[in-house]
């Protein structure tokens, strides 16, 4: 009998140990944040000329790319009440402000806003407000930020450096800032660092509340029907 008990203990002990290892593995699995998943998506699109293959529900531009990267169930970067005078960038910025998510510091996965990247109102002046958006990919030791965005018909990587916003390259020839606004008849060309307007984190606070379930409504309807028959 003691032999059987020993074998049973070994078998069940091994099973329990294996089960505990599986449980530990499940517990150790990292949780992927919204910003991490969005950044992974955006990076996978670099080099693409259109978003139409992924979705026809967003505009094929910088705000559409950013929305699509973060899009999940009940999560859209756009507010529910986009105003007639707003573009996608200003609408997203307004929602970020309302949620208290605006920041002056770039972090991987954060939204980055730019102003005056093109002559939106076609008056030749530097007065066009928020006009461009992207997703921060990484922040270098020298302060150079790499971001993913859709510009010029292409999803691409570009750089800016807020410590040296007017410098195209450093002393070693490394690019600090890419060009983001072309030279116009009345304006010079501008580097990305000169046009940064701020950042915004994206987390669960951007997600819309779960809609109320209809079960209670159905019960009420059935109850009313029974009452009516009486």
Kindly label every feature range from the protein language model.
Residues 2-11:
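Bacterial N-terminal signal peptides
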Residues 6-7, 57, 81, 127:
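Exposed boundary/loop context
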Residues 12-18:
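Sec/Tat signal peptide C-region and signal peptidase I cleavage site
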Residues 18-81, 189-230:
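N-terminal capping segments
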Residues 78-155:
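...with weaker cross-activation on analogous glycine-rich loops/strands in unrelated enzymes
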Residues 122-230:
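Aromatic- and glycine-rich peptidoglycan recognition patches
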